[in-house]
Amino acid sequence: IGQALLERVVYDEDGQLLTGSFTDYAMPRAAEGPPFAIMSRPTVATTNPLGAKGCGEAGCAGGLPSVVNALIDALKDRGVTRLDMPATPEVVWRLANGL
């Protein structure tokens, strides 16, 4: 969600990174998101001695297009057919107001 709505890497014309710290690189904080219900269903992997396996890598890829497509759908009456990430509040406001 943060990557779709806030996070942006910016370089200047010389290739210098301009968003290299949390001071100028937006990341969502807990207060900015909806409440989440966390459920755990532990299943031990039998293919390695630790019983460990990945837990979130595969699930994060669908979030980006889901958020952006939801915004495009919400703004379709305004003629919006494309929205580049990040869809910051300012970007969405401008699109909603035809700017």
What does each model-identified segment do?
Residues 2-99:
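C-terminal catalytic domains of large/alpha subunits in multi-subunit enzymes
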